[in-house]
């Protein structure tokens, strides 16, 4: 998180319109405050604490850019949540990220994991024209739709239904089949709940916004 805070602070020093909104809570809060204080832009760091439901949605829609510096996002859920709000993403190239972020279509994917590279990407996206930003915004929304949890869960449910329609064979096969069906039912219940919810918790995540 300090890595990201340094990058955003670097941009904030040069661009007085840039603010950094942090959603969530964790042990890095004091370090981030120190980074922004030392850079002379402490007044542009905003920490909301943990937000849920409508408050989280409102915060996402108040932003212009989603800055993501984690290399451990295995499923890309956090990224698609941000993209659903029309936010282009600036993120490090990593597993789970590169499957979602498409360079210059819905954000910027940074190959070099350095503060300088991340700072440069943030400067690039904040300097984008209105048309370029609109293109990224629409690309983000399209990606969120493609990765919608409800759609993914529905596809999985279709597979389970197709599996359940088959009949068992031998007695041993029947026992194996009963075990398989028990597993399918458990997974089915989980996926159906996910499909009905259609959302995922974001948790402690950093968001950067450039206010116009």
Residue ranges and their predicted role:
Residues 1-10, 20, 27-33, 116:
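A conserved mid-protein helix/loop that constitutes part of the nucleotide-sugar donor-binding site
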Residues 31-51:
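Nucleotide-activated donor-binding/catalytic signature segment of Leloir-type glycosyltransferases, i.e.
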Residues 50-51, 58-63:
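Short alpha-helical donor nucleotide-sugar binding micro-motif in glycosyltransferases
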Residues 71:
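Aromatic "clamp/platform" in nucleotide-sugar-dependent glycosyltransferases that forms part
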Residues 88-91:
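Short hydrophobic beta-strand element within catalytic cores of glycosyltransferases
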Residues 103-104, 108-115, 124-130:
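Conserved acidic donor-binding segment of nucleotide-sugar-dependent glycosyltransferases
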Residues 131-146, 158:
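A short, well-ordered alpha-helix in the C-terminal region of glycosyltransferases
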Residues 150-212:
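C-terminal amphipathic helix plus adjacent low-complexity
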């Amino acid at each position: 998180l300090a890595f990201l805070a340094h990058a955003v602070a670097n941009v904030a020093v040069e661009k007085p319109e840039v603010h950094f909104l942090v959603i969530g809570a964790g042990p890095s809060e004091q370090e981030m405050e120190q980074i922004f204080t030392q850079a002379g832009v402490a007044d542009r760091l905003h920490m909301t604490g943990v937000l849920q439901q409508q408050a989280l949605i409102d915060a996402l829609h108040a932003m212009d850019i989603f800055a993501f510096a984690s290399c451990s996002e295995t499923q890309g859920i956090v990224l698609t949540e941000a993209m659903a709000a029309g936010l282009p993403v600036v993120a490090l190239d990593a597993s789970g990220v590169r499957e979602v972020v498409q360079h210059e279509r819905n954000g910027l994917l940074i190959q070099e994991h350095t503060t300088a590279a991340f700072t440069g990407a943030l400067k690039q996206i904040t300097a984008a024209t209105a048309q370029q930003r609109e293109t990224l915004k629409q690309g983000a929304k399209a990606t969120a739709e493609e990765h919608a949890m409800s759609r993914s869960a529905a596809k999985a449910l279709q597979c389970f239904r197709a599996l359940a329609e088959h009949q068992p064979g031998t007695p041993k096969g029947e026992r194996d089949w009963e075990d398989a069906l028990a597993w399918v039912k458990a997974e089915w219940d989980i996926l159906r709940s996910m499909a009905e919810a259609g959302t995922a918790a974001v948790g402690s995540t950093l968001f950067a916004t450039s206010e116009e």
